[in-house]
């Protein structure tokens, strides 16, 4: 039971990391678009 929760937590952390990465890339792309 404990392991299952741990795995879920890892998945949540991974998802958060991806969201942060994605938003960072999105902001970079937005800045690049404004520069043009």
From Swiss-Prot:
It comes from Bacillus subtilis (strain 168). InterPro entries: YfhE-like. This is Uncharacterized protein YfhE. It holds the Pfam family YfhE.
